[in-house]
From Swiss-Prot:
Its EC number is 2.1.1.74. This is Methylenetetrahydrofolate--tRNA-(uracil-5-)-methyltransferase TrmFO. It comes from Bacillus cereus (strain ATCC 14579 / DSM 31 / CCUG 7414 / JCM 2152 / NBRC 15305 / NCIMB 9373 / NCTC 2599 / NRRL B-3711). It catalyses: uridine(54) in tRNA + (6R)-5,10-methylene-5,6,7,8-tetrahydrofolate + NADH + H(+) = 5-methyluridine(54) in tRNA + (6S)-5,6,7,8-tetrahydrofolate + NAD(+); uridine(54) in tRNA + (6R)-5,10-methylene-5,6,7,8-tetrahydrofolate + NADPH + H(+) = 5-methyluridine(54) in tRNA + (6S)-5,6,7,8-tetrahydrofolate + NADP(+). Keywords: Cytoplasm, FAD, Flavoprotein, Methyltransferase, NAD, NADP, Transferase, tRNA processing.
Length: 434
């Protein structure tokens, strides 16, 4: 057994998973959790892996990417998924848990491991020696300041302002056209043209749609220079036509005329399977958001892989800062995990902790850190946060659009997703003993 100790800062989903993975590999862990000494605005207990929002870990089927990532984690002996399975409550095809039992179970498994020492204190500086930072979206101000100092002001963010992302295969290509404004450079945008009548229908639905209520600690985010599309719309219908939906320079090649308004879609991934809706950061609830977006010509049947969000979320610019091993590029023994890395969601956060934990243990044991291939769900997430365009980087949930493309194109969605899942699970089995 190595005498080196790994520091894990934060006992949320990612930190708890990381600590467990390190400990089970025979490495000592110091797990720092500032609760209950200092609470966050969202937490209510001193338990590890407290679920502060929904009690659902989302889909549990293999036709959904988050279901695949769960199955990969089961094969890799994830403490988070084991506890979730043991504390599950009826939820149809989803995995939902009794949140109190779940947090208690994770706390018990991690705290009682002989290689884990729990330190209930706030960390305000980045420790020397092997360390995983998994402090989550509500990282304390003092540590945030140190992380900002470490990563550089331009690479450290305090809130999400993400536009929705759709699957290219679900866009009606007969209704959209490829063009850049004024034909500058290569044709890089898919354009969804609107008549005045279509715009009016869209506008009325947008301003009437229900928004997510802001929590007290989130109320400052709209003053940071990034405004939700529905707030812009509330200032008058022309605000959008002269803003994110301006049609000038975007003549429709089919008619030769300039539409009344245009919604632009920009490629979001290297493979060209995902497109984001430009300028559509939003605080709409997901149900109404889908209804509004499907009023856009060409997006009537759009598959939304990430909904637009605006919320408090401390995260780093991982493409500039991290390797797909979750190591910090400038310091081999420093790892990041959880939502701070730009993975979005309970399961994705835990999965990043699993891989960061495995790699931290391997590092102190003198072994090479592991990069999971992007044909796996966990590997595709690590690849997304480290290889995507750094300039427009925003957090992302697991989705099949991030997976490496299949060798053979499969038209039917369910069959295609099953093929992604089968390939992922076949591949991950090669890594279960690392």
């Amino acid at each position: 057994m190595t005498t080196q100790v790994v520091n894990v800062i934060g006992a949320g989903l990612a930190g708890s998973e990381a600590a467990y993975q390190i400990a089970k590999r025979g490495v000592q862990v110091r797990l720092y959790e500032m609760r209950p000494v200092r609470q966050t605005p969202a937490h209510h207990t001193d338990k590890f892996a407290e679920l502060v929002c929904s009690n659902s870990l989302r889909a549990n089927t293999l036709t959904n990417a988050v279901g695949v990532i769960k199955e990969e984690m089961r094969l890799m002996d994830s403490v988070i998924i084991r506890a979730a399975d043991e504390c599950s409550v009826p939820a149809g095809g989803a995995l939902a848990v009794d949140r109190h039992e779940f947090a208690a179970k994770v706390t018990e498994y991690v705290k009682n491991h002989p290689n884990v020492t729990v330190m209930n204190e706030e960390i305000t500086d980045i420790p020397e020696g092997p360390t995983i930072i998994a402090t989550g979206p509500l990282t304390s101000p003092d540590l945030s300041a140190k992380l900002k100092e470490l990563t550089g002001e331009d690479y450290f963010y305090f809130y999400d302002a993400a536009a929705p992302i759709v699957e290219k295969d679900s866009i009606d290509m007969n209704k959209v056209y490829l063009k850049s404004r004024y034909d500058k450079g290569e044709a890089a945008y898919l354009n969804c043209p609107m008549t005045e009548e279509e715009f009016d229908r869209f506008y009325e639905a947008l301003i009437a749609a229900e928004t997510v209520p802001l929590k007290e600690f989130e109320k400052e985010i709209f003053f940071e220079g990034c405004m939700p599309v529905e707030v812009m719309a509330s200032r008058g219908r022309q605000t959008l036509v002269f803003g994110p939906m301006k049609p000038v320079g975007l003549e429709d090649p089919k008619t030769g005329k300039t539409p009344y308004a245009v919604v632009q879609l920009r490629q979001d991934d290297a493979a060209g399977t995902l497109y984001n809706i430009v300028g559509f950061q939003t605080h709409l609830k997901w149900g109404p958001q889908k209804e509004v977006l499907q009023l856009i010509p060409g997006l009537e049947n759009a598959e939304i892989v990430r909904y637009g969000v605006m919320h408090r979320n401390t995260f780093i610019n991982s493409p500039n800062l991290l390797r797909p091993t979750y190591q910090y590029k400038q310091r081999d023994d420093l790892f990041f995990a959880g939502q701070m890395t730009g993975v979005e969601g309970y399961v994705e956060s835990a999965a990043s902790g699993l891989l960061a934990g495995i790699n931290a243990a391997r590092l102190v044991q003198g072994e090479e850190p592991v990069v999971l291939p992007p044909v796996t769900a966990m590997g595709s997430m690590a690849n997304y946060i480290t290889a995507t365009n750094a300039k427009n980087f925003q957090p992302m949930n697991a989705n099949f659009g991030l997976f490496a493309p299949l060798e053979k194109k499969i038209k039917k969605k369910v069959e295609r997703n099953e093929a992604y899942a089968a390939r992922a699970l076949e591949t991950i089995r090669n890594f279960v003993n690392i």
